[in-house]
Amino acid sequence: MSQTFTKSQVAEHKDDKSMYIIIDDGVYDITNFLDDHPGGAKILKRMAGKDATKSFWKYHGKSVLEKYGTKLKVGTLAEAAKL
């Protein structure tokens, strides 16, 4: 079941027990993907708990998100209140 997360909730998931990243408006659990990431675990650990959108699109195409996204996506990012 998909959840809605705030940025602060995603930020809580930044250690070896639970690592989430944000890509666009999606929230992805990368905890069990670290060893499978072709670029290594280090960069994923550095981005854990953060918005990785710019970094992701700098190095990956749409096909990467299509391939892994459905397995890793745990929810969406809540819209920030606009003043």
From Swiss-Prot:
Heme binds at H37, H60. Residues 2-78 form the Cytochrome b5 heme-binding domain. Pfam families: Cyt-b5. GO terms for cellular component: intracellular membrane-bounded organelle; membrane. One of its GO terms (molecular function) is metal ion binding. Keywords: Electron transport, Heme, Iron, Metal-binding, Transport. InterPro entries: Cyt_B5-like_heme/steroid-bd, Cyt_B5-like_heme/steroid_sf, Cyt_B5_heme-BS, Cytochrome_b5. Belongs to the cytochrome b5 family. This is Putative cytochrome b5 B11H24.095. It comes from Neurospora crassa (strain ATCC 24698 / 74-OR23-1A / CBS 708.71 / DSM 1257 / FGSC 987).
